[in-house]
Each structure stands twice: as C-alpha cells, then as structure tokens.
Regions:
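N-terminal-proximal low-complexity accessory segments that begin disordered
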Residues: 34-98
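Long, well-structured alpha-helical subdomains associated
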Residues: 55, 84, 498-598
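An active-site-proximal "capping" alpha-helix that borders the catalytic cofactor pocket
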Residues: 63, 276, 486-503
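Contiguous, non-catalytic segments that form substrate-binding/exosite surfaces or channel walls
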Residues: 120-243, 249-443, 449
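Short, glycine/acidic-rich hinge or "gate" loops at secondary-structure transitions
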Residues: 277-284, 301, 475-479, 506-523
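Short alpha-helix carrying the canonical HExxH Zn2+-binding catalytic motif
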Residues: 450-463
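Post-HEXXH active-site segment of zinc metalloproteases
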Residues: 468-491
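Extended, compositionally biased alpha-helical segments that mediate assembly or anchoring
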Residues: 579-687
Length: 687
C-alpha cells in the first residue's frame, strides 16, 4: 500500500485488499502554500483544438476530511483513464505508449518536420483518447512519414509494447499499417444505415461479430415485456469463443482488472471518509459492482446514488455513456469528481422542484406523460477532475442514471458543470457576432446569451432526459431504435429545453427576467445547428456524432416546416449566409410538434419513423455552405474544439498523517499527459 493511502485508511482496513495504487506526489506542511500567477484560461493550441484550464473555487475552504475524500475519488478517477483508450480501439494503447516512449527518450534531432509532426499526432491521440477524432470519428492522418516513424522507434533506447515473441521489426510493421493505412479501421463509430454498423466501426466493444449476431444474442436475454431490466452489455466486451458469442465482463478478476483493482482500492479509502451514511452506502455498492460485475449490482448502486442528495461531494465513476457503441449498449469508462456550487444550485434546484409542472405541460400525448415525477434532483457542481471519456473534452451538463426504469421509479440527478462553463465563457470570442445577422440579434445575444445557454443546459439535463414514459412492453432504446436511439434521446432533451425556453413560467420562477432570454436561446440554437457546428466536420463528410445529428435534425425540420410562414429565413449579406428567426412563437409551436413526435417514437419504439427523420434531416451537409462556414471560422482563428488540463491534487503530510490536500493548476498539456502515462498505465498494451 502506498504511504498516502496508508495515511488515509490506516493499517488493516478493507482498502488493504486489492492492488496498491502508485505513490502520488506529496508535499510536506512547509510546502503547502503555493503562490499562483495570474490565471490563464487558454494555455495552448494545436490542430483543431485549444487547451483550457478551469479554476476550482471553494476547494481551499473544504475541511481536511472532505479534501481527503475528494483526493481519494480523484485518484480512483485517474486510475481508470486508460480503460477508455482500450475500449475505443484495440491498438490505442500500443500506439500511445510507443509514441510516448519516443517523446520521452528519442536522443536524435527533435527540430525536424517529422518529429514535430509526430509530437502533434501524439497530442491529438491524447486529446481524443485514441487515434480517431473524438467528435468526427475519422482516423487521424499523420503528417510524418512511415519511414520516419520506423526510424524513431529504432533510434529510441526504450522498451516498446511488443507482443509476446514479436520482433521489433514486426512490431513496427504492425503499427505502421494501423497508423498509416487509411483503409484500416478508418471510422471509430459508424452509424450509417448502408452498412453493418459493427463491422464498419473500429470501436473495441465487439470482436468477430456482425450486427445481426449481436442483436440475436441479446434478444434471447431480454425478458419479453419486462420494464425493470438491467442494461444488457453495459460493462462487457462481446467476443466469439469457439464460435459462441461470449461476454468478457469488466470487473475485479475480469477484463481490465489491473486498473479496476486500483479504482476499488481508492473507492474503499473514499468510503472511510464519507460525509454521511447515504454516501457511504452508495460508494460500497459501487465497490461491490466493480467486484462482481453484476448489472443488478450496478442498478442497486445507481438507486443508492440517486437517493444521496445531501452530500456536498459527488462522483460519477463507471461505464456510463453508450455513444461510442454503434448499437448504444456498451458504456465507456468515465469519472467526474465534484462538489456542490451552492449559489448556482439555487437556479437548477428551482427547475428540479417544478419538474411535475413541466411534465404536465409537455406537448406529449397524454399516455406518454408521467403521472407522477419521482426524485428529480438538480444542482450545479464545481468540477475537481474528470477522466476517461469525460476528459480532456468534457460535457457541460450530466443527467444520470440512464436506465429508464430507475428514472421512473427512483428519479435522477442532473448537474451543470459550473466552473467548466465559466472557463468556456471566458474564451468565447467573436464567433456569435460573426454568425448573427442584425443588431437586434447581436444585442440580444450579448445581453442574454450566457444565461440562455445556461438555462438550456439545465432544462435539457434536469427536465428533458427525465421526461416522458414508454408504453407498456416497449423495450429500451438500444433494442427498439438501435443505432438511432442516442440521436433521438439528445434531440428529445434539446426540444424540451427549447419548448420551455420562451415559457412565461421561467419568468414566474425567477429564472430569467423576460422571454427575450428564450428568444436568445432560439437564435443560438439555429445559428449553431445550421451553421456553426459545421466547422467541426471535415469537408465532404456526413454528420456522424449524435449531438450534431440531433441539432441538425431539429433545426432542418423546423426550417422546412416553417417555410410557408417564413419562420426561419435564410439570408445572405456580403457573401455570407445567415439563418434568422423571424417568428419565435411559431418556432416554439414547431418545436412542440416535433417533440411530440419524437416522444411518440420513443414511447412506441417506432424504428422506421426515427430512421426516416434522421436520414432525411440529420446526416447530409450542404457542401457549399459547409465550405463557407469553414472559411469564416478560419478567418476568425478560433479552433473548433476545446479540452482541459486538469488540476493536480497533492496530499500534504505531517509525518504519516495527511493534514491537508493542496490544489495546483498545471499549464502544460504534454507534461500532464506524460505524468499520467507514468502514474496510471496499469493495463497491458494488448487486452
């Protein structure tokens, strides 16, 4: 056991069981008072991204026990970070570790075009948790040559992750094909209706299986008509063993055990520092899930986690979101460690308290509304650290758990990541002004845009995802709507937020000063969906990512259905295209109509209807408009994406006792990634 973990748990506690976490950086009491220079939010740019930092206001005010709790959860989060790499692609860890060895140890000339290009490629791999773009899902195209790569490997005096009995030359040849051949595993996640989505996707959730084989396998496991069912496949990889589909479960003693044992050790330590019994019970149930791999235990944990609404500190840790699975079943590892932001929580808490009113006033068919909304809680959080699929890019809002039956019977938690949103707002620049048409739209956005965006996230997470109900006997989205389920669910939640954005109820609740805030939200959404988000797609490519598809589905559908009344107008000025909302009230009506239809599709499992909507409105891009948007962004010099360097927590020791935890704000992305690679590389390169 590491000295720091021993200082938290003491000898002979349950956290002694399992693997020893690595010894973290630590400080003595004399070193515990850092002096920070002026805080820079943006610290670096490369490729199509910029690297930001966020502050963690309020951390220093936490008491010592709470800081120890946060520190244990921080370590548990980072111990699982490399699981995400392997889940996304079977070669990610071998490529990543090879490039890291070159970056650390190559003794030759580093001031060459090839070495600079290799360094850039490695940064992109770190940013995406793999060799495919984190948003567009296309494989990166290296700007260094295959021969240069081979020379770098041969010339670096370091150990590389060779397979058993593999020669260095064979290893180089294998990775060269993976990195440089554009036809090999070109797309991380393919959701095209024209192909088998499994055989055309590089993601590492399945091996040697077709989409029909997987669907048949889980159809046999599903209980006909059951409503309270586990999330089949969530924490496993499905492979063929002797021709039979077999799940490799991710748990202690199973797949990824080397990392999961460390996660469990730190969660055990965290449980000893728990704030209250509810938090302690939830952490113990999470530990049990990691030990057993049982999805019933996962449900038990989620129920306990939803019930813990009083704790100041919170954590998401597990196999959570299913966006990286083309079938929408398997969760990618992520963790978010946070504590409550009391000031911002008052706003989101007001929305949560009115959840029944919102449900009653949904434009759904009556049978698709919940008669009684249960256990909706909402808060704004201050993020301490994120890892796995939540880092370096991060959500700005979270609503969990994803299980419909747990939401219905036990409720859900919704959070807004307040300090992350603040960091984004600090670097917004002139993008909104570039794509806004006239003075009224610009002034409205400058006055209300930040509040409009915040309320949209709150309504999306707190009300949107938790709204509505399935008709009796209808299965979960991955069974009924398959590869279109995630797009529908994100569109449904966005439409809920949009539908209520201009409702006077928000003024009555004190959430906004006037419906002009809602008008700003409509302007923002249409600008982003029909113009701004196109900057995130390479020319000639379709939309693949679920959030992008959802936005274009909504906006393109509303534009087409409002043409007769000129609700949204396409205008041109100085050779630039704009989409202008002329009638916000009629646009709200259109949003309500589409929301009713999407809820009907979800509630009834109408696959044909969602396929028609997505393929008609959400996939294809106007090539001329696409090129125009890319050119306008290039002139602005604003990268399409942003991610974060995370804070570092350093335990402060007096002898063997932790007396404090210090927070530091690193500003070097490469240094942090190499530090993480040194401290948290628990998994074999080949799994």
């Amino acid at each position: 056991m590491s000295r720091v973990l021993s200082a938290i748990v003491g000898a002979g506690t349950t956290a002694d069981q399992g693997a020893d976490p690595p010894a973290p950086a630590r400080a003595t009491v004399a070193e515990a008072a850092p002096a920070y220079p002026e805080f820079r939010v943006e610290v670096e740019r490369f490729a199509d991204v910029r690297i930001l930092r966020y502050r963690v206001p309020g951390f220093e005010a936490l008491d010592a026990r709470t800081k120890k709790l946060v520190y244990c959860l921080y370590e548990a989060a980072l111990c699982g970070r490399e699981i995400t790499y392997d889940q996304k692609y079977r070669y990610n860890l071998s490529v990543k570790r090879t490039l890291e060895q070159i970056a650390r140890s190559y003794p030759g000339d580093r001031d060459t075009a090839d070495f600079r290009a290799l360094t850039l490629y490695l940064k992109r791999v770190w940013f995406a948790n793999g060799i495919h773009h984190h948003y567009g899902h296309d494989k990166f195209r290296p700007e260094f040559s295959a021969s240069a790569f081979a020379a770098f490997v041969r010339g670096t005096p370091a150990e590389f992750p060779l397979r058993e009995r593999q020669s260095l030359e064979d290893f180089i040849a294998e990775l060269t094909r993976v990195i440089f051949d554009p036809g090999v595993d070109a797309k991380l996640v393919s959701k095209s209706a024209d192909h088998d989505v499994l055989t055309s996707s590089a993601v590492n959730f399945y091996s040697d299986l077709t989409q029909p084989e997987v669907e048949a396998f889980y159809a046999k496991q599903a209980v006909e008509g059951a409503e309270a069912r586990v999330s089949l496949g969530l924490n496993s990889r499905l492979v063929k063993v002797d021709g039979v589909p077999t799940e490799q479960v991710q748990k202690v003693g199973g797949r990824y055990t080397e990392a999961i044992e460390r996660i469990v050790a730190w969660l055990e330590a965290a449980a000893l520092c728990a704030e209250n019994e509810a938090q302690h019970a939830a952490l113990k149930k999470l530990i049990r899930f990691y030990r057993t791999g049982s999805l019933e235990d996962w449900d038990d944990y989620n129920i306990a986690w939803v019930r813990d609404t009083e704790s100041h500190v919170d954590v998401v840790n597990g196999f959570i979101e299913v966006y990286n699975d083309p079938l929408g079943m398997r969760g990618t590892f992520e963790s978010v460690v946070s504590f409550r932001d009391p000031e911002a929580t008052r706003r989101i808490g007001t929305i949560a308290a009115a959840a029944q009113w919102f449900e009653d006033h949904m434009p759904f068919f009556g049978r698709h509304k919940k008669e009684s909304v249960t256990g909706i809680s909402g808060k704004a959080i201050t993020v301490v650290i994120e890892s796995g699929d939540a880092s370096p890019t991060t959500p700005i809002g979270i609503n969990l758990p994803n299980s419909d039956w747990i939401r219905r019977e036990h409720g859900s938690k919704s959070v807004t990541l307040a300090n992350v949103v603040a960091a984004y707002n600090a670097v917004r620049g002139g993008v909104d002004r570039e794509f806004s048409f006239g003075p009224a739209e610009i002034q409205r956005n400058e006055r209300y845009g930040e509040l409009a965006a915040t309320l949209h996230v709150d309504l999306h997470e707190v009300i949107g995802h938790g709204s509505g109900q399935l008709e009796r006997g209808v299965g979960p989205l991955h069974e009924t709507l398959k590869n279109y389920g995630s797009t529908l669910e994100e569109a449904r939640a966005d439409l809920v937020a949009l539908y209520f954005a201009v409702d006077p109820k928000l003024v009555e609740l004190g959430l906004m000063p006037s419906v002009e805030v809602g008008y700003a939200a409509y302007d923002q959404f249409i600008r982003n969906a029909l113009l701004q988000q196109l900057n995130r797609v390479e020319l000639g490519k379709d939309l693949e990512e679920d959030h992008m598809r959802n936005r274009q589905l909504i906006a393109a559908w509303a534009y087409e259905h409002g043409l007769k009344d000129n609700v949204i107008e396409r205008r041109t000025r100085d050779g630039k295209t704009f989409f202008v909302v002329n009638d916000h009230a009629k646009l709200r009506s259109l949003f309500g109509q589409l929301l009713r239809e999407l809820q009907r599709i979800k509630s009834t499992g109408d696959y044909a209807a969602i396929r028609e909507l997505v393929e008609r409105y959400a996939v294809k891009v106007d090539p001329a408009l696409h090129a125009e948007v890319r050119a306008r962004y290039a002139a602005l010099d604003v990268p399409a994406y942003a991610g974060f360097v995370g804070p570092r927590l350093v335990p402060v020791l007096r002898g063997e006792e932790i007396v404090d935890v210090r927070i530091e704000y690193p500003d070097d992305f490469t240094a942090q990634m190499l530090e993480y690679a040194d401290r948290y590389a628990f998994l074999p390169a080949w799994n």
